[in-house]
Amino acid sequence: MWHNDHMSIEKVSTQLANLPPAWMSRVSGGGGAMGNAAEIRKMLGEPLPQLVDPNSLSKGIAAFFGPRGLLERLRRKLSLISRKKGGKILPAKNTIASVDEDDNLYVGVDFLEQFGEDEDLIAGILAHEWGHMMSDLPRKVDWSHLTWDQLHALRRDEEGDADGFAGRAMFLMGYSPKAMVGFLKEMDRRRKNKKIPCHKYHNHATRAAILMESYEAERRAYNFAKRLFFNENKTPGVKIGRIIGSG
């Protein structure tokens, strides 16, 4: 069963309230070492996207970046899930989305023009970038001694972790990962047609599996926590007492 009723911030808060306290520490554990992840990108020759003047945006695209726009609503939900506020959301070009060491999120204007009506996909893309903010790479580490292959392997692991966070976050926000999986498949098809090698990501099948498995794992954890810690009338306490008493 897909979780498709795109949730308001209040509903996301209710979802989190149905989970035991230990869950949050698991989702938000580590985190905050984005500076090193950004440094690895720089070493691999990946500059930050070029900003677009907000005043040059069409009315429809500008609405995405407004205080009541979709991107801000998603930022609030992801902030609630991760306990990370995030930085500014900035319009950019020649990119889908990216995040920098200050947690500023760059979202591609061309991407929004093409896929702006696909809220599931936009949520998945932002959740993936938010996952980079949760990086557990240690701080103040010099990566310059690593070979190119080692740097690419480290980057693939980072991307896999971000996909895993995205899958979990999409469940909690009420979005289906199907659009994200389909988008990755299409990007992979285009890359292969152009015979462009890709070293920084796992293959499409692996990324799709990470997204789907993490989504389903969060759904199972959520449903199990509801059964374990809450009664049918959604009040806590009695079931916990029974479990402790039966021990």
Indicate where each model-derived feature is located.
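Catalytic Zn2+-binding segment of zinc metalloproteases
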Residues: F111, E117-D120, E129-H145, L172-Y175
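C-terminal capping/extension segments of zinc metalloprotease domains
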Residues: S8-L16, P20-G60, G66-V99, N104, ...
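Flexible, glycine-rich surface segments
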Residues: L121-I122, V141, H145, D149-A153, ...
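Alpha-helical hydrophobic/aromatic positions enriched in membrane-embedded helices and signal peptides
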Residues: D120-L121, K195
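Soluble periplasmic/extracytoplasmic beta-strand elements of cell-envelope proteins
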Residues: N104-G108, G124-I125
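Short, functionally critical alpha-helical segments immediately adjacent to catalytic or ligand/cofactor-binding
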Residues: V27, A123-H128
